Design a protein with these regions (language model features):
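Short, low-complexity, Pro/Ser/Thr/Gly-rich segments in the mature regions of secreted, periplasmic
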Residues: 103-111
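Short nucleic-acid-contacting surface segments enriched for D/E, G, S/T with interspersed K/R
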Residues: 76-94
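Structural detector for short beta-strands of small beta-barrel domains
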Residues: 22-56, 97
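OB-fold (S1/OB) nucleic-acid-binding surfaces
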Residues: 48-73, 112
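Flexible glycine-rich surface loops and low-complexity tracts that mediate binding to linear polymers
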Residues: 27, 88-104
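Sec/Tat signal peptide C-region and signal peptidase I cleavage site
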Residues: 13-21
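Positively charged n-region of N-terminal signal peptides that target proteins for export
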Residues: 1-8
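A short, structured loop/turn motif at beta-sheet edges
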Residues: 20-24, 62-64, 98-100
Length: 112
């Protein structure tokens, strides 16, 4: 019985390591502070606002209007992209990563 419990516990701990990578293409980037109001019209969210609210972090609005926050690495990647772009609004990306709850652990991101 102890062996079965140990194997079950080990399996549960290893499950996140086998999480499937998901890709989201042509989705809007929004800062966390503005995410609730921006979900309705994410394309109207501006680069200026995103940079002004950068301390709250960033995420994407999916096609089904769900907001997924980025992990720290994703925040750093999108912040660098936002600082480098001339776009003022309609900030969209292709992003891949492991979704865990309402957070995406970003493995790749490309500003469109």
């Amino acid at each position: 019985m102890k062996m079965l419990a140990s194997l079950l516990a080990l399996g549960l701990m290893a499950a996140p390591a086998f999480a499937a990578t998901e890709s989201f293409n042509d989705v809007s980037v929004v800062d966390v502070a503005c995410s609730k109001k921006a979900v309705a019209d994410a394309d109207s969210h501006t680069r200026e606002c995103a940079l002004g609210c950068q301390k709250s972090g960033f995420g994407i609005v999916t096609a089904d209007k769900k907001f997924l926050k980025f992990d720290e690495a994703g925040n750093a990647k999108v912040l660098a992209a936002l600082k480098a772009t001339d776009k003022t609004d309609h900030i969209r990306v292709n992003v891949s990563g492991d979704v865990q709850g309402d957070t995406i652990k970003v493995t790749s991101i490309k500003l469109l």
